[in-house]
Protein backbone atom coordinates (compact mmCIF):
# COMPACT_ATOMS: atom_id res chain seq x y z
CA UNK A 1 0.00 0.00 0.00
CA UNK A 2 1.09 3.55 -0.64
CA UNK A 3 2.77 5.19 2.34
CA UNK A 4 1.22 8.35 3.77
CA UNK A 5 3.34 10.96 5.48
CA UNK A 6 1.84 11.02 8.98
CA UNK A 7 2.03 8.50 11.81
CA UNK A 8 -0.34 5.57 11.25
CA UNK A 9 -1.73 3.45 14.08
CA UNK A 10 -3.39 0.13 13.33
CA UNK A 11 -5.79 -0.97 16.07
CA UNK A 12 -6.61 -4.68 16.17
CA UNK A 13 -10.24 -5.64 16.69
CA UNK A 14 -11.26 -9.21 17.44
CA UNK A 15 -14.17 -11.21 18.84
CA UNK A 16 -14.86 -10.33 22.48
CA UNK A 17 -12.48 -7.34 22.54
CA UNK A 18 -13.32 -4.75 25.20
CA UNK A 19 -14.69 -1.61 23.56
CA UNK A 20 -12.80 0.82 25.79
CA UNK A 21 -9.48 -0.88 25.06
CA UNK A 22 -9.58 -0.09 21.34
CA UNK A 23 -11.96 2.88 21.26
CA UNK A 24 -10.00 5.02 23.73
CA UNK A 25 -6.70 5.01 21.77
CA UNK A 26 -8.67 5.49 18.55
CA UNK A 27 -10.42 8.47 20.14
CA UNK A 28 -7.14 10.02 21.31
CA UNK A 29 -5.87 9.90 17.73
CA UNK A 30 -9.05 11.52 16.43
CA UNK A 31 -8.56 14.44 18.84
CA UNK A 32 -4.82 14.69 18.06
CA UNK A 33 -5.67 14.78 14.35
CA UNK A 34 -7.09 18.27 14.95
CA UNK A 35 -3.52 19.43 15.58
CA UNK A 36 -1.85 17.16 13.02
CA UNK A 37 -4.17 16.14 10.18
CA UNK A 38 -1.64 13.58 8.92
CA UNK A 39 -2.14 11.33 11.96
CA UNK A 40 -4.20 8.28 11.13
CA UNK A 41 -5.78 5.48 13.13
CA UNK A 42 -7.68 2.58 11.63
CA UNK A 43 -9.13 -0.79 12.59
CA UNK A 44 -7.52 -4.05 11.49
CA UNK A 45 -9.14 -7.48 11.81
CA UNK A 46 -8.27 -11.02 10.83
CA UNK A 47 -10.75 -10.77 7.93
CA UNK A 48 -12.89 -8.08 6.30
CA UNK A 49 -16.05 -9.03 8.15
CA UNK A 50 -17.92 -7.54 11.12
CA UNK A 51 -16.47 -8.28 14.55
CA UNK A 52 -18.62 -8.56 17.68
CA UNK A 53 -17.10 -7.11 20.85
CA UNK A 54 -17.53 -8.37 24.42
CA UNK A 55 -20.45 -5.97 24.93
CA UNK A 56 -22.18 -7.10 21.73
CA UNK A 57 -21.30 -4.05 19.64
CA UNK A 58 -20.52 -4.97 16.03
CA UNK A 59 -17.51 -3.20 14.52
CA UNK A 60 -16.37 -3.12 10.89
CA UNK A 61 -12.62 -3.14 10.21
CA UNK A 62 -10.94 -0.80 7.74
CA UNK A 63 -8.39 -3.46 6.78
CA UNK A 64 -7.76 -7.18 7.14
CA UNK A 65 -4.47 -8.98 7.70
CA UNK A 66 -4.44 -9.79 3.98
CA UNK A 67 -4.43 -6.07 3.14
CA UNK A 68 -1.18 -5.59 5.06
CA UNK A 69 -1.84 -1.89 5.72
CA UNK A 70 1.18 0.36 6.10
CA UNK A 71 1.49 1.44 9.73
CA UNK A 72 3.99 2.71 12.28
CA UNK A 73 2.48 0.91 15.28
CA UNK A 74 0.00 -1.89 15.87
CA UNK A 75 -2.11 -1.83 19.04
CA UNK A 76 -3.55 -5.06 20.41
CA UNK A 77 -6.15 -4.10 23.03
CA UNK A 78 -6.58 -5.99 26.28
CA UNK A 79 -9.57 -7.60 27.87
CA UNK A 80 -11.03 -11.07 28.17
CA UNK A 81 -10.99 -11.71 24.42
CA UNK A 82 -7.19 -11.64 24.30
CA UNK A 83 -7.05 -15.14 25.77
CA UNK A 84 -8.28 -16.67 22.53
CA UNK A 85 -5.94 -14.47 20.50
CA UNK A 86 -2.81 -15.87 22.15
CA UNK A 87 -3.21 -18.92 19.89
CA UNK A 88 -4.17 -17.02 16.73
CA UNK A 89 -1.44 -18.04 14.28
CA UNK A 90 -2.64 -15.55 11.68
CA UNK A 91 -2.18 -12.74 14.22
CA UNK A 92 1.33 -13.95 15.10
CA UNK A 93 2.22 -14.12 11.41
CA UNK A 94 0.82 -10.63 10.81
CA UNK A 95 2.87 -9.14 13.65
CA UNK A 96 6.11 -10.56 12.31
Predicted feature descriptions by range:
Residues 1-96:
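Extended, subdomain-level signal for the structured scaffold at the beginning of enzyme domains
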